[in-house]
């Protein structure tokens, strides 16, 4: 296990469903690794996954290309390579969004 983190974001009315937080990878100095996101409760504020990886050397705020969006549903888990850029979004309709993030070597 490299890292376990619980992240809770709260409702914001000035955020848009079309926007997302800054794309990132979790732990740059431990590549390669896997990430598992576990959604603690139902919410909105999708997780956004990009086609881009760390090796693409892109400008994240202008060049990132969205691959898919995953909605937080209680008990849902998403497993992916740790070098894939991803981002969360603050909830708009729900009061909170809680995710447990596991980064680990396989």
Protein language model regions, located:
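Catalytic core of non-heme Fe(II) oxygenases with the double-stranded beta-helix
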Residues: 1-106
